[in-house]
């Protein structure tokens, strides 16, 4: 092949590799990712975001109390973890309304749980456990803080409403504690019962009606299959992909009015179900969590691989409001801040619950020593997630949270006169996902395309360089062949200069000498 043609081929390959594969394709790919992430009405992403077809893994672990009477007498609590009670959790966003003026949409959240015995490791929900009666203890705690003079009334009301309990612990089946409910009898006509029940009825989201004047109390029952009242407004990300999913309002308010001064009331991050793509190691994963009335951030920790896909591993915790100035607004009061990885939720949920990581992971040692049976472990009890950085797809995520009550001696309540002081764990939950093979396959298809383009880039660049080099070499080789070689003939001494045999002028210059010298 002629050098010129080889040069054209080599240059074309080189130009294709550099201009198309190396320069044009990456921006095109990024633009497509940005476009696909937007929550545009009718798009595939909008459908997945609003009604994810695959359930989340929802695991509940209860702490069984093995020495309830001894605790009542003042001894240290001994606990035994029982779980997981595994539930398939379906989350739907309902009553969606688009707001074109600011590229946002509003929705309510609906969560539904279905018990999955095949993944509950032999547990059925029929197991009888002894646990703190959260409703009784919450009533005691709130009365002490808000109306301590009413403790006498509360004593009488507890006897009537809960049928003269022997302790603040209750023996019940796991399914009753979690979803089916424990009985609350508000049929009494006495003043004490009527007064306390009127307060309980105001919190209708915590009780399920079970006939006239009768209710059922459980940890999750009232929320199961129910559209939650919070109206959440998020950005769609059509105008700016970085804004996708960001929370801007809850119930028409642009910030909370729960916490003290500072940024604690601000809505930071997304609604935790979608995140902006093209992550870097410097980006935090920030989301607003309505169940604890605050935003939380997860930070890059390491590079990982999930199901054959390269991911970024992130970790999160509850912070330390006692030592971090920007978190002090989460303190119940300026002089009553909890320490690291503990958060008082009283203002948020209306019950004196304290959030922590499971088994008090990362909390001060003194709280761990208040009870027996806790064994914190980072891998099993930490908050962690793995994101594919280009699409911000969570391939694996584990959100874990424990709920506790701070208990102590209450002289004016007969069942707690000798109670030990302790941070008492009640239960902990893990909400997680390991992305299914169907969705992983789609991701791998994208990365296979990227790999093919990457291969084409280097193949065309290397091939183009080699072909261009070969063309240049061939060109110079042919150039050398076309040179006229002149050999100098030097006659030896005494020899007569002669032309070679049969050589004439015409044979030397046949192409240069015209056949007819008189042609002109």
Swiss-Prot record:
It holds the Pfam family CD36. This is Sensory neuron membrane protein 1. GO terms for molecular function: scavenger receptor activity. GO terms for biological process: sensory perception of smell. Residues 1-5, 473-520 are cytoplasmic. It is a multi-pass membrane protein. The keyword GTP-binding does not apply. It is found in: Cell membrane. GO terms for cellular component: cytoplasm; plasma membrane. Keywords: Cell membrane, Disulfide bond, Glycoprotein, Membrane, Olfaction, Receptor, Sensory transduction, Transmembrane, Transmembrane helix. Belongs to the CD36 family. The chain crosses the membrane at residues 6-26, 452-472. Disulfide bonds join 264-329, 293-348, 331-337. Glycans are attached at residues 64, 224, 268. Plays an olfactory role that is not restricted to pheromone sensitivity. Residues 27-451 are extracellular.
